[in-house]
């Protein structure tokens, strides 16, 4: 995500639960990185929100959230006015968001269900893939390959 988004002109702020993951994010093009704690409480939520605001004082325009849970609200608090919060998944649990923040920030929360999207809008989905592959073939970014496997080891 970092490389693709940078290739499209975005300033990328990556968050992760370990220094090792943040290092990969940096190698993959993140401009800023923020470590988040594995166990969240109210104080840690406030700290995470403050850390995000420190690297993006004017707020974050687009938040791509695959984690959810207790990590969602601090991110929403760091969103820019008229920002977009993309709900991609919720591996840390279904988030509970104070909707008054959407009013105060004049932002949007958008659910992104790629599985359904590719079935309902196959032409747009194909164009998105074509655009990404073109960026790869044009040398704008190189996908991260973390592992390789023999074909015999596949299922």
Language model features with spans:
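Conserved small/polar residues in nucleotide/adenosyl-binding loops
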Residues: 1-3
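Adenosine-nucleotide cofactor-binding segment
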Residues: 7-71, 124-127
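Conserved beta-strand positions in the Rossmann-like core of class I SAM-dependent methyltransferases
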Residues: 13, 86, 110
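Helix-to-beta-strand junctions that scaffold the AdoMet/dcAdoMet cofactor pocket
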Residues: 79-80
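Glycine-centered, small-residue-biased loops immediately flanking beta-strands
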Residues: 83
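Rossmann-fold NAD(P)-binding glycine/threonine-rich loop
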Residues: 92-105
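C-terminal hydrophobic helical "lid"/dimerization subdomain
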Residues: 122-155
